[in-house]
């Protein structure tokens, strides 16, 4: 009723709530990549923080049809892993991820082995995060003291701490891991569904 009343406020002629359609978050992402493309068939890989529960999905698009085939669910999320490092390097979560990505070329990926203690990456690119290092599922911060101890520093406070080579190397390392996962996922789903075209969304 609340939604119906809000719609009536915007459109006095609105009569019924029967036509309201809530589209799945990841299906919407996949549609935004596949349907505007020139492709008649493609496998669509979507990765983000979290939709309803899905964090990574594989869909197959053919002509005007799109079907999600498999999902990875919260709290295992490549997007939230990236956001955890956004937080750790002193940038704002859900807006500063581009800064972390922009910082990556200035560093060296020397912390990849340590990051792999946080995430179990399978050969097909699927993954699971070790929740012992994170707070985002249960707390008010992205990471915790175990995460800090792994890398030897607390999260950077942007109010009084400058970006150092350490933060550049951290950024480079998480970028490297993110790319490794996306490449493995892309190769495995291309092989599994025997479709050469790939759309990315998220």
How should these model regions be labeled?
Residues 1-202:
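Short acidic/glycine-rich loops and adjacent helix/strand connectors
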């Amino acid at each position: 009723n609340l939604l119906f009343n809000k719609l009536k406020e915007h459109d006095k002629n609105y009569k019924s709530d029967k036509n309201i359609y809530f589209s799945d978050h990841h299906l919407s992402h996949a549609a935004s990549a596949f349907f505007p493309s020139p492709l008649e068939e493609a496998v669509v890989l979507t990765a983000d923080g979290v939709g309803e529960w899905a964090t990574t999905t594989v869909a197959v698009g053919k002509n005007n049809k799109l079907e999600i085939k498999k999902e990875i669910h919260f709290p295992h999320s490549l997007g939230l892993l990236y956001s955890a490092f956004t937080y750790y390097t002193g940038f704002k979560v859900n807006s500063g991820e581009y800064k972390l990505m922009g910082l990556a070329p200035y560093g060296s990926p020397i912390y990849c082995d340590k990051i792999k203690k946080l995430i179990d990456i399978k050969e097909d690119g699927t993954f699971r995060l070790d929740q012992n290092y994170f707070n985002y599922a249960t707390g008010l911060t992205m990471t915790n003291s175990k995460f800090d101890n792994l890398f030897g520093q607390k999260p950077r406070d942007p109010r009084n701490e400058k970006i150092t080579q350490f933060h550049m190397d951290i950024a480079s390392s998480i970028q490297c891991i993110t790319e490794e996962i996306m490449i493995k996922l892309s190769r495995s789903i291309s092989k599994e569904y025997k479709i050469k075209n790939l759309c990315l969304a998220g």
